[in-house]
Amino acid sequence: MSLKGKDFLSVHHLTVDEIYQIFDFARILKAKQKAGEPHPLLKGKTLGMIFQKASTRTRVSFEVGMWQLGGSALFLSSNDMQIGRGEPVKDTARVLSRYVDGIMIRTFSHLEVEELAEYATVPVINALTDLLHPCQAMADIFTALEHKGELKGRKLCYIGDGNNMVNSLLHICAKVGMDISVATPANYAPDATIVEQAAVAAKLSGSKITILDDPLAAAQDADVLYTDVWASMGKEGEQAIRKQAFAGFQINNTLLQAAKKDTIVMHCLPAHRGEEITEDVIEGPNSVVFDEAENRLHVQKAIMALLMAD
């Protein structure tokens, strides 16, 4: 079982064994980093990073990760590239493949990422699209594994917008055998195709998917409570409408009481405190938000090394 030379576009494309292979390697790399032990697995390698959406955690974690692995990362914004001026994606893919050893892309269109991967001859990593956020979901469930010790039979409850984040969480929870309950307002449900894909995986793993519009019901006996912003990047114009629609879809102390006593609280950040999550919960003892943010580094390093190392 080898991920060498493959793309990382979606958790849906991974086997359960491949998910745990990434987790196991992330655990090893995290221990090495904490011990100050060098691990230059990508010495002499370069990652080209295409950003059409701004980011804090994605850019820093990939750049630092490549540096810790002995390689280098090249930041490419759409303002700096011909892809931002109308060059075909397939041309960009083939040109960059002659210069770099891997391509990471954070953009709007998932179809664009798939086209990039089709024409690139080096591994392509999806760092976020409007449809999926697989690197974040992998880091989230790795964090749950660290804190809970076992994933199968655990329950994750997601409260909020049916966006790219919950789409990837549906994929991974179904794969690893975690139950997932999703509470969203009417008209803000997760992508129907993603739900169908997750349902197929859930049948194989024995997990359960529940989608409803009642946050308290969704949170009952949850091992993990998860939320994200009400208006994702590109949806800022809908802020006022969404504030009204999502009123009540908030992780707060009332919701915390419905979940298990030892539930962990997650948010992929940035958080709008007082909207999708309260200040006291994100800063409280159940919150693992910053463990989760750190684990982006370790999980992404594992992905890069498994895809790009000789």
Residue ranges, per PLM feature:
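Positively charged, low-complexity intrinsically disordered leader regions
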Residues: M1-V60, V64
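Phosphate/diphosphate ligand-binding glycine-rich loop within oxidoreductases
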Residues: G36-L145, R273
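Phosphate-coordination loops involved in phosphoryl transfer and adenosine-cofactor binding
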Residues: L42-L47, K152-R154, D262
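Glycine-rich phosphate/diphosphate-binding loop of Rossmann-like nucleotide-binding domains
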Residues: Q52-V64, K148-T227
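Short, structured coil segments at secondary-structure junctions
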Residues: L69, Y99, Y119-T121, V176, ...
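Rossmann-like adenosine-cofactor binding region
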Residues: V200-E279
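Adenosine-phosphate binding glycine-rich loop
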Residues: D262-T263, L269-D310
